[in-house]
A protein has these predicted regions:
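Catalytic core of non-heme Fe(II) oxygenases with the double-stranded beta-helix
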Residues: 94-155
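Non-heme Fe(II)/2-oxoglutarate
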Residues: 1-107
Length: 155
């Protein structure tokens, strides 16, 4: 018997991890002080305080997001966003919010609309390793998900 085997290897794209400099972090905190509209009604998370975040003078877009989009394009290309139209579209920053997350609040698995997405953590009130060690010793689990950001990646 001869098997007719065809191999399929889907193309995968990577993601970027960026350490923000002090200017970018200070800009986000400054925007957070001027928080405007509640944003909770547009989100799936179980977080009490979520607000729209306005990027003053497009600082975040110009100095962080756009350079990351350009870097991503040089590294991986942008062919995953091919749109069946004859005009080219330029990326822009849209729908930015800030969550003030407290103990016992969480975000379930969810998706972000748009082509690219990002998250920034500015103040984490605990140490990951302490959380993982504590709960592992209690229930002897193999996985350490307490206080983690889980990334479900498909294409």
């Amino acid at each position: 018997m001869t098997l007719d085997i065809n191999e399929h290897q889907p193309k995968n794209y990577g993601w970027l991890e960026v350490d923000l400099d002090d200017d970018a972090v200070n800009h986000i905190w400054s925007c957070a002080k001027d928080k405007k509209q509640p944003y909770k009604d547009r989100l799936v998370g179980h977080i009490e305080s979520s607000y729209e975040l306005l990027d003053k003078n497009d600082y975040l877009w110009k100095n962080v997001i756009k350079p990351c989009v350009n870097y991503y394009g040089r590294r991986y290309g942008h062919d995953h966003i091919t749109i069946p139209i004859e005009t080219s579209l330029k990326p822009y920053l849209h729908n930015v919010w800030i969550n003030y997350q407290n103990q016992c609040e969480y975000n379930p698995i969810h998706d972000h609309g748009g082509v690219y997405s990002f998250a920034a953590w500015l103040k984490i009130p605990y140490d990951y390793y302490m959380q993982a060690d504590h709960y592992t010793s209690i229930d002897n689990t193999k996985a350490h998900f307490n206080g983690t950001f889980c990334f479900e990646y498909t294409n």
